[in-house]
UniProtKB/Swiss-Prot annotation:
Component of the ribosome, a large ribonucleoprotein complex responsible for the synthesis of proteins in the cell. The small ribosomal subunit (SSU) binds messenger RNAs (mRNAs) and translates the encoded message by selecting cognate aminoacyl-transfer RNA (tRNA) molecules. The large subunit (LSU) contains the ribosomal catalytic site termed the peptidyl transferase center (PTC), which catalyzes the formation of peptide bonds, thereby polymerizing the amino acids delivered by tRNAs into a polypeptide chain. Component of the large ribosomal subunit (LSU). Mature yeast ribosomes consist of a small (40S) and a large (60S) subunit. The 40S small subunit contains 1 molecule of ribosomal RNA (18S rRNA) and 33 different proteins (encoded by 57 genes). The large 60S subunit contains 3 rRNA molecules (25S, 5.8S and 5S rRNA) and 46 different proteins (encoded by 81 genes). GO terms for cellular component: cytosol; cytosolic large ribosomal subunit. Keywords: Cytoplasm, Ribonucleoprotein, Ribosomal protein. It comes from Saccharomyces cerevisiae (strain ATCC 204508 / S288c). Gene3D superfamilies: 6.20.340.10, 6.20.370.70. Present with 21000 molecules/cell in log phase SD medium. It is found in: Cytoplasm. This is Large ribosomal subunit protein eL34B. The keyword tRNA processing does not apply.
């Protein structure tokens, strides 16, 4: 019959954080090796796609790595993907353009009203 292994930590339950892998040591003994949970890639806050250029780590491990592993040198780097940043910049530009156009149209209508009043007198 195969050799049995037991958990090496205090938690006796088969939970997601207490997974083990049975490993044979050089001495021929089977031991339980605790397996860490897999890390997920950081996602874009707008579209949900995986962010490129950012390390895939467990949340606590981000505290131990340098800033270059956590960001990219761009606006919203490490938070939004390049396509979403491009979209935001274009949208902001178009909104500003629309404000300027609205202001110019308003000034033109006011000037037209003033000229009508002068021509009536």
């Amino acid at each position: 019959m195969a050799q049995r292994v037991t958990f090496r930590r205090r938690n006796p339950y088969n939970t997601r954080s207490n997974k083990i892998k049975v490993v044979k040591t050089p001495g021929g003994i089977l031991r339980a090796q605790h397996v860490k949970k897999l890390a997920t890639r950081p996602k874009c806050g707008d579209c949900g796609s995986a962010l490129q250029g950012i390390s895939t780590l467990r949340p606590r491990q981000y505290a131990t790595v340098s800033k270059t592993h956590k960001t990219v040198s761009r606006a919203y780097g490490g938070s939004r993907c390049a396509n979403c940043v491009k979209e935001r910049i274009v949208r902001a530009f178009l909104i500003e353009e629309q404000k300027i156009v609205k202001k110019v149209v308003k000034e033109q209508t006011e000037a037209a009203k003033k000229s009508e009043k002068k021509s009536k007198k």
